[in-house]
């Protein structure tokens, strides 16, 4: 495994990965292995989503989400459903869609209850994220989540917090952990963003960081935050980066508007990047027929 820049990774004021032997000892202790890109040669999948805000299934412009203690007046909502999270989960199960994600866009009890309802409706078929940490991660697995999704918890002061990452891997296992590496462009590079996508970290999404983080997680989830929720088209450059360098399965979300965008993700990602569609779908108030995306998904699998 390559040694990463010591500027990226810190813990408790100590710098990690300054020397190759330090990296080797840490990796050996965690018992993680360097992933192989061979894992990614499979059919591209459509990964459905259920975004929950204050107990309701919504589609929002994620970059406008602020802490719930604020008045929320800046929140831009594209859609609010009259269907429950549980109903969406049942639909995804009936349509044979796996690996979708349930995201709680707030830590309120209503959102937590809605997420758990979805997990109960489709045990083992959905991943869950939003406020996940070492204390609550196993409870969501026990409620039926296939994986837990974490982002802000494993970042601290703009760096990767290795103690937290090590801790959560030891609890749920690499095979049930997904790292959300959602990012925004900054100075021409993609920087991972945390805290409801409001804070830039110092961690740049590139070949080295993807390779390193792939040793700790089963999959990546990456929202192109600059285009997410805006239905302006995909971030093709980001998709290409993921297709070229992700050593484990990765799902891209952001900007899909028409079926051609889904095909562009397949092509730009070299068949290695799965796709999530949100606001554009007719089940979320958009114009893109959900049934067409499901049919496309099953067609990909029939080709393999």
Curated annotation (Swiss-Prot):
Pfam family, one: His_biosynth
Enzyme class: isomerase
Listed GO biological process terms: L-histidine biosynthetic process
Superkingdom per UniProt: Eukaryota
UniProt xrefs under InterPro entries: Aldolase_TIM, His6-like_euk, His_biosynth, Isoase_HisA-like, RibuloseP-bd_barrel
Residues that, per the record, bind Na(+) 2: 152, 155
UniProt-annotated binding residues for Na(+) 1: 59-60, 228
One Gene Ontology cellular component annotation held by this UniProt entry: chloroplast
Record key words, sorted: Amino-acid biosynthesis, Chloroplast, Histidine biosynthesis, Isomerase, Metal-binding, Plastid, Sodium, Transit peptide
Catalytic activity: 1-(5-phospho-beta-D-ribosyl)-5-[(5-phospho-beta-D-ribosylamino)methylideneamino]imidazole-4-carboxamide = 5-[(5-phospho-1-deoxy-D-ribulos-1-ylimino)methylamino]-1-(5-phospho-beta-D-ribosyl)imidazole-4-carboxamide
SUPFAM superfamilies in UniProt: Ribulose-phoshate binding barrel (SSF51366)
Transit peptide: 1-61
Assigned EC number: 5.3.1.16
Cofactor note: Binds 2 sodium ions to optimize substrate binding.
PANTHER family according to UniProt: 1-(5-PHOSPHORIBOSYL)-5-[(5-PHOSPHORIBOSYLAMINO)METHYLIDENEAMINO] IMIDAZOLE-4-CARBOXAMIDE ISOMERASE (PTHR43090:SF2)
Record family assignment: Belongs to the HisA/HisF family.
Role played: Component of the histidine biosynthesis pathway that catalyzes the isomerization of 5'-ProFAR (pro-phosphoribosyl formimino-5-aminoimidazole-4-carboxamide ribonucleotide, referred as 1-(5-phospho-beta-D-ribosyl)-5-[(5-phospho-beta-D-ribosylamino)methylideneamino]imidazole-4-carboxamide) to PrFAR (phosphoribulosyl formimino-5-aminoimidazole-4-carboxamide ribonucleotide, referred as 5-[(5-phospho-1-deoxy-D-ribulos-1-ylimino)methylamino]-1-(5-phospho-beta-D-ribosyl)imidazole-4-carboxamide). Essential protein.
Protein name: 1-(5-phosphoribosyl)-5-[(5-phosphoribosylamino)methylideneamino] imidazole-4-carboxamide isomerase HISN3, chloroplastic
Source species: Arabidopsis thaliana (Mouse-ear cress)
């Amino acid at each position: 495994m390559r040694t990463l820049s010591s500027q990226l990774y810190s813990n408790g004021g100590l710098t990690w990965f300054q020397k190759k032997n330090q990296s080797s000892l840490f990796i050996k202790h965690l018992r993680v292995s360097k992933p192989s890109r061979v894992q990614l040669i499979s059919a591209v999948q459509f990964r459905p989503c259920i975004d929950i805000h204050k107990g309701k299934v919504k589609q929002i412009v994620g970059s406008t989400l602020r802490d719930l203690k604020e008045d929320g007046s800046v929140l831009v909502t594209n859609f609010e459903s009259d269907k429950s999270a549980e109903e969406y989960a049942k639909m995804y199960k009936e349509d044979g869609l796996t690996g979708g994600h349930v995201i709680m866009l707030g830590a309120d009890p209503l959102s937590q209850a809605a997420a758990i309802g979805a997990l109960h409706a489709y045990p083992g078929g959905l991943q869950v994220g939003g406020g996940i940490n070492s204390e609550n991660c196993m409870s969501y697995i026990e409620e039926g989540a296939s994986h837990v999704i974490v982002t802000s918890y494993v970042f601290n002061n703009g760096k990767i917090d290795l103690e937290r990452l090590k801790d959560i891997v030891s609890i749920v296992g690499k095979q049930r952990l997904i790292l959300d590496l959602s990012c925004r462009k900054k100075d021409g590079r993609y920087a991972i963003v945390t805290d409801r996508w409001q804070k830039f970290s110092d961690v740049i999404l590139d070949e080295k960081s993807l390779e390193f983080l792939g040793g700790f997680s089963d999959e990546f989830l990456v929202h192109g935050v600059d285009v997410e929720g805006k239905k302006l088209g995909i971030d093709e450059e980001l998709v290409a980066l993921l297709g070229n360098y992700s050593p484990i399965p990765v799902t891209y979300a952001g900007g899909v508007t028409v079926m051609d965008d889904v095909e562009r993700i397949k092509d730009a990602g070299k068949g290695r990047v799965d796709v999530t569609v949100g606001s554009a779908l007719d089940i979320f108030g958009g114009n893109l027929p959900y049934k067409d995306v499901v049919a496309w998904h099953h067609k990909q699998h029939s080709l393999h």
